[in-house]
Amino acid sequence: MTSSGANYLRKDALILTHSDQIEGLETLVQSLPQLVFRIAALTEMSPKLLSMLSYKNVVLYQNVSLKQIEQLYLESDIYLDINHGGQVLQAVRKAFENNLLILGFEQTLHDRHYIAREHIFDSSQPDQLASTLEEALSGVEQMRSALQAQGRHANDVPVSLYQETLQSLLGGQHG
C-alpha cells in the first residue's frame, strides 16, 4: 500500500550511498542543471565525492542521521538508485513509500520490485535516464503517469482503494 506521501514535482533527486561509486553521476549532473542532486551518506565522504561540490546543483550530506534522511525523503520527489555497493537502509522501498519517482541503472539496482521497467536503463546510456527524468518533471500529468507505472509494477494498492474494498467486504460498516 502506498503511503499518503505527495509528489510535488520538485526538481530534487535523492541518492543514498555507502561509497563514492555512483554510476553516471557527473553526466547526469551536467545534463540536468535544473535538478538538485542531494547525495547522503551515513559516513564521511571521499575526496572524489566531495569534488562534486564544484557543481551548483549538488548538495552533499556527510555523516547523515536517520532524522536527516527522513527529512531528505520529504524534500525530494525523485530517488536515483545509481550507487554501487549495498543499499542504504532499504532506501528504494522507503523512496517508494514516500511517493518518490525511482529511476536507476540495470547495473546498480538494489530493489527492482519498486522500479518500473521503463525507469531502468543501461549504465552506458545515462542520457536516456536524464531524458525520462526531464519528461516526468515537465508536468503534473507526466509525473502522475510515471508514478502510476511505478505503482503498477509494484502491484501497489492506493490506501483509498484498500479502504473502499475493506468497507465493502465488511458490509459498509465503519470501525
Regions found by a protein language model. Name each.
Residues 1-51:
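Conserved catalytic-core segment of nucleotide-activated headgroup transferases in glycan assembly
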Residues 47-64:
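Nucleotide-activated donor-binding/catalytic signature segment of Leloir-type glycosyltransferases, i.e.
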Residues 69-70, 87-89, 107-113:
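Short glycine/proline-enriched, acidic/aromatic patches that form the donor-sugar handling elements
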Residues 74-87:
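Acidic donor-binding loop of glycosyltransferase active sites
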